[in-house]
């Protein structure tokens, strides 16, 4: 069973629908017992980093996630991926879960092409940097759907894939059993479904 962690942030319905389409059992829950009972965990998220971390802390889930991430695969999606990092500079400075070394920084100041819009909204090719079971059913250069104004930085050793947005945007990270995708697999059509299928088989 996959537990989609419900901490009041994220579009949980589309994610659960994508997993159901694959025939995968998924439960939306903020209950520590459900998280511990699950085979795999997904941490979704949309919105601001600081607010999301505050909600995770308020629900008491931070120590549960740190404990369980050592035992089973965890996938952070979009803001959920950013929460995996040590720190974010979105509207101030905030500590993250600390699974992935590096920081979450604003995209706009780093763009080589200042005519590009921020947030990055839309489809972008994902370039795989190395073999990993998460890419079992995904080909290099396939397109995935992004919506973000911040990105993971100083994390090259943990980066599995990037997309070009006048600079290499961190698309996928990994640290131990913990994975993160900046793009939304649940909004990325067939390629996204195939990535979720591979995650369910980890």
Predicted regions and their residues:
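N-terminal beta1-alpha1 ligand-phosphate binding loop
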Residues: 2-24, 183-187
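Structural alpha-helical scaffold elements that stabilize or flank donor/cofactor-binding regions
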Residues: 34-35, 68, 172
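An anion/phosphate-binding loop that grips the pyrophosphate of nucleotide cofactors and donors
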Residues: 38
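Structural motif
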Residues: 42-44
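Cysteine-nucleophile active-site neighborhood
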Residues: 49-120
């Amino acid at each position: 069973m996959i537990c989609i962690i419900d901490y009041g942030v994220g579009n949980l319905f589309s994610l659960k629908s994508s997993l159901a389409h694959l025939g995968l059992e998924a439960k939306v829950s903020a209950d520590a017992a459900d998280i511990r009972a699950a085979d795999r965990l997904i941490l979704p998220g949309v919105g601001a980093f600081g607010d999301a971390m505050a909600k995770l802390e308020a629900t008491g889930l931070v120590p549960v996630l740190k404990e369980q991430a050592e035992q089973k695969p965890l996938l952070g999606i979009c803001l959920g991926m950013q929460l995996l990092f040590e720190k974010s500079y979105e509207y101030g400075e905030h500590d993250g879960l600390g699974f992935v070394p590096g920081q979450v920084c604003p995209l706009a100041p780093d763009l080589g092409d200042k005519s590009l819009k921020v947030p990055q909204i839309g489809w972008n090719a994902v370039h795989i940097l190395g073999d990993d079971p998460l890419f079992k059913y995904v080909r290099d250069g396939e397109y995935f759907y992004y919506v973000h104004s911040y990105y993971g930085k100083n994390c090259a050793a943990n980066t599995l894939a990037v997309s070009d947005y006048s600079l290499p945007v961190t698309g996928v990270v990994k640290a131990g059993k913990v994975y993160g995708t900046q793009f939304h697999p649940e909004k990325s059509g067939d390629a996204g479904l195939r990535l979720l299928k591979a995650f369910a088989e980890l």
